[in-house]
Curated annotation (Swiss-Prot):
This is Putative replication factor C small subunit L510. Part of the RFC clamp loader complex which loads the PCNA sliding clamp onto DNA. InterPro entries: AAA+_ATPase, ATPase_AAA_core, DNA_pol3_clamp-load_cplx_C, DNA_Rep/Repair_Clamp_Loader, P-loop_NTPase, Rep_factorC_C, RFC_lid. One of its GO terms (biological process) is DNA-templated DNA replication. It comes from the Viruses. ATP binds at G47, P48, P49, G50, T51, G52, K53, T54. Pfam families: AAA (PF00004), RCF1-5-like_lid (PF21960), Rep_fac_C (PF08542). It comes from Acanthamoeba polyphaga mimivirus (APMV). CDD domains: AAA, HLD_clamp_RFC. Belongs to the activator 1 small subunits family. RfcS subfamily.
Length: 363
């Protein structure tokens, strides 16, 4: 039996039913109608990460197949096998398997098809997607496909034309706070609303990331809650945690927003604002370069730093609307280069140098 403590919270608290999914009612009604009739079409789910795309199709599978769910729903992560060979071998072998209609004792009919889920489908090559088009047509009676992606523009027209496209919008802060508060109470954590809002802020609206961060946050929460415990009553793990935490400059018994930023490997907005102010005040590229080196030495992931810097840019009173627009657009290119394995120091220097130039009306 798997220890409950070892189960990732994103799986432990994944919605099992359609009504538990936080999305628009029209979307849920569409899914419920499909499950009631058992006449599911091919789907293409797209939208920001952590908005319930995978949870929705899994919940639909449970509604349609009941106790036969495990045998009728097959998941593939397209980012692992993104080429045509994976399509020809793994996916084709599953798609061509025929399954029989089953009638349960209560009269419920389990339809004679299965569901293949292709997560991160936008990472598949165009060649692999073209091969899938043939498979969809050939085995549509035995298999229903559900493509899941963040960017629909990376899906070929051949796939899009054969699927019902459904957009999953970003979850509201209120919905995320309610969900995180529910989870924290179930895990015996009483967190104030400002902490939950900070978790949402550093997660950028990604519910999956927020729940993972909340799970990591539990160790800090338990440590601070037990600061008043006597040493003889502490477990070995708690003693090791104290040894690690006492290496820091200061420890308080209260949970703070700084704890959230530290656990998420993000800089605070105040620190980000200071970096933007220092960048604007730089007089030459040498000063910008030295500032970039100091930021790199902080040890935070650069994409996290850039995200926080952009938030401060949007609220800056030292830049006009035109300057802010230029910087935000330019930062998109920087983040793309980061995802394509660009050098962190060079891309950070590129970003800060551009902010400096724009602030002085040189660009």
């Amino acid at each position: 039996m798997i220890d409950d403590e070892s189960v990732p919270w994103i799986e432990k608290y994944r919605p099992k039913k359609l009504e538990d999914i936080t999305q628009s009612q029209n979307l849920l009604d569409l899914f419920k109608n499909s499950t009631k009739k058992g006449e599911m079409t091919h789907f293409l789910f797209y939208g920001p990460p952590g908005t319930g795309k995978t949870s929705a199709i899994l919940a639909m599978g449970r509604e349609i197949f009941k106790e036969h769910f495990q045998n009728r729903v097959i998941e593939f992560n397209a980012s692992d096998d993104r080429g045509i060979n994976a399509v020809r071998e793994k996916i084709t072998n599953e798609a061509k398997k025929y399954v029989a209609e089953i009638k349960l004792e209560d009269g419920t009919i389990i339809p004679s098809y299965k569901i293949i889920i292709l997560d991160e489908a936008d990472s598949m090559t165009d060649e692999a997607q073209d091969a899938l088009r043939v498979i969809i047509e050939q085995y549509s009676t035995a298999t229903r496909f559900c493509f899941i992606c963040n960017y629909i523009t990376k899906i070929t027209d051949a796939i899009k034309s054969r699927c019902s496209s459904v957009y999953f919008k970003k979850l509201s802060d209120e919905c995320m706070v309610e969900k995180l508060n529910d989870i924290s109470l179930k895990e015996s954590m009483e967190l104030p609303k400002n902490i939950l809002h900070t978790i949402i802020d550093v997660s950028n609206g990604d519910m999956r990331k927020a729940i993972m961060l909340l799970q990591n946050f539990k160790y800090t929460y338990n440590f601070k809650k037990n600061l008043t415990k006597k040493l003889k009553d502490m477990t070995l793990l708690e003693l090791k945690t104290i040894l690690f935490m006492t290496k820091k400059s200061s420890i308080t018994s209260t949970i703070s927003e700084e704890d959230v930023y530290e656990i998420s490997a993000s800089i605070t907005l105040d620190k980000a604002k200071g970096i933007i102010d220092d960048t604007i005040d730089c007089n030459n590229i040498v000063e910008v370069s030295n500032l970039s080196k100091k930021i790199i030495a902080m040890g935070f992931p650069i994409d996290n730093i850039l995200t926080q810097l952009n938030k401060c840019i949007l609220e800056s009173n030292k830049l006009d609307v035109n300057q802010i627009s230029k910087i935000i657009i330019y930062s998109g290119d920087i983040l793309l280069k980061m995802k394509e394995c660009g050098n962190e120091y060079i891309q950070l220097l590129n970003y800060l140098a551009y902010v400096n130039r724009v602030s002085k009306h040189f660009d």
